[in-house]
Design a protein with these regions (language model features):
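N-terminal "arm"/small-domain region of PLP-dependent enzymes with the aminotransferase-like
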Residues: 7, 11-76, 207
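Active-site phosphate-binding strand-loop segment of PLP-dependent enzymes
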Residues: 53, 153, 157-211
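PLP-dependent enzyme catalytic core of the Aspartate aminotransferase-like
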Residues: 61, 65-69, 73, 96, ...
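Conserved N-terminal alpha-helix of the aminotransferase class I/II PLP-enzyme fold
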Residues: 65, 69-113
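Conserved PLP-anchoring active-site segment centered on the Schiff-base-forming lysine
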Residues: 120-139
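Active-site PLP attachment segment
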Residues: 223, 229, 236-269
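PLP-dependent aminotransferase class I/II
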Residues: 252-319, 324-327
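Conserved PLP-binding catalytic core of the aspartate aminotransferase-like
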Residues: 306-355, 365, 369-370, 377-379, ...
């Protein structure tokens, strides 16, 4: 009992340290479906500018109806892992559909996108191999690389010259197989990876190219296939990226679940060796059925994608017009740079009072001195929503001294 109390005291100290340093995270509870507008528990309706609901599909009537149909036809859950009795026809259909959508041969589903990255490397790469990773890659990628025995190399963020050097080093040190892994879109900056240049470097050094497309699938590229389409690496429907990981928890409906798509042999080896696939319950039928409906919508029309990008262009221009510094780009992730952590939190808090829901990010989520409010634009936002949001930003910016007093 004394040991238990000592441990709990230790945990308490860590929690208090998080609070003292302004790093303690609280959950703001909403009482409505996810959408352009949400209601908080105090009854306020606010414009939601912090969801990954890029295409507005989280509560789309056709997606919800598909989930309900799948619930009725295939049940609530499977109570099994895939290789025992947890594979339904819906699962195989979704795997085939997402692979085809991305231009790859096959795909494997996971209960979470974190798993798709977390278990990719260990089954595929051994002690004689190497993995080369962007320094700003997502935590799931970092954790996955730590689990494997391959040699690890890191290149400076989005630095192609450094990537070239690390690939040369990996080859010079005798790596058998080399995999380069990057986020397609980096979630804190909205930076889009230069996959075309990376493909050329990988070809020069005989390396595989793998990409996490969680913040791209469904809306990046002319038909929403992702960053590889955006960068010209989708030829006649065939991907020139070797392996793609992604999620159904963002643009593709916003529920949960992840996937890895790639060559048929790679996917088959993952089915045999990836531990979450072998030891975790299968993805629920309602999510699978709804995700198939999402792909139906995206293959029928680019209207949602087009609306998202129109909203993004307008919002970026309007925010720059009132005087805010935003990270350049064309992605619906719009970092509004504040630099000071306290000011970022104050700005987010004041915006909530003004009816706009955003979140301030600061160290250790972003580097010290790089605090920002991250805005995520959606196809579900009306033009009026965005006009109101920019006006609220301008008012809060003036009040906090982030903008000149006469900023409009």
């Amino acid at each position: 009992m004394q040991d238990t109390q000592a441990f709990l005291n230790h945990v308490h100290v860590q929690l208090q340290d998080l609070r003292d340093n302004g790093l303690y995270k609280t959950e703001r509870v909403i009482t409505t479906p996810q959408g352009a507008h949400v209601r908080t528990t105090d009854g306020r309706e606010v414009i939601n500018l912090c969801a990954n609901n890029y295409l507005g599909l989280a509560a789309h009537p056709q997606v919800v109806a598909a989930a309900q149909r799948s619930l009725e036809s295939h049940g609530f859950g499977l109570s099994s892992v895939r290789f025992i009795c947890g594979t339904q026809d819906l699962h195989k259909t979704l795997e085939q559909r997402i692979a085809r959508f991305l231009g790859l041969e096959d795909a494997i589903l996971y209960a979470a996108a974190f798993d798709a990255n977390g278990v990719l490397f260990e089954p595929l790469l051994g002690e004689g191999d190497a993995v080369v990773s962007d320094t700003l890659n997502h935590a799931s990628i970092i954790d996955g690389i730590r689990l494997c025995k391959a040699r690890r190399y890191r290149y400076a963020h989005d630095d192609m010259a450094d990537l070239d050097r690390q690939l040369e080093l990996a080859r010079a040190e005798g790596a058998r197989h080399v995999m380069v892994f990057t986020d397609g879109v980096f979630s804190m900056d909205g930076t889009v990876a230069r996959l075309d240049e990376m493909r050329a470097l990988c070809d020069r050094h005989g390396a595989l190219l793998a990409v996490d497309e969680c913040h791209a699938t469904g809306f990046m590229g002319a038909t929403g296939r992702g960053t590889h389409e955006h960068r010209g690496l989708l030829d006649d429907g065939r991907s020139r990226v070797d392996i793609i990981t992604g999620t159904f928890g963002k643009a593709l409906g916003g529920a949960s679940g992840g996937f890895t798509a790639g060559p048929r042999e790679v996917i088959e080896l993952l089915r045999q060796r990836s531990r979450p696939y072998l030891f975790s319950n299968t993805l629920a039928p309602a999510i699978v059925g709804a995700s198939i409906a999402v792909l139906d919508l995206l293959e029928e029309s680019t209207a949602l994608r087009d609306r998202l990008h129109a909203n993004t262009r307008w919002f970026r221009a309007a925010m720059a017009g009132v005087g805010f510094e935003i990270k350049p780009g064309d992605h619906p992730i719009v970092p509004v740079m504040v630099y000071d952590a306290v000011q970022a939190q104050r700005l987010a808090a004041r915006l909530l009072e003004l009816g706009v829901y955003v979140v301030g990010f600061f160290y250790p989520v972003v580097p010290k001195g790089q605090a920002r409010v991250r805005v995520q634009v959606s196809a579900a936002h009306s033009h009026e929503d965005l006009v109101r949001a920019v006006a609220a930003f301008a008012q809060a910016g003036r009040e906090l001294g982030l903008l000149p007093a006469d900023a409009s």
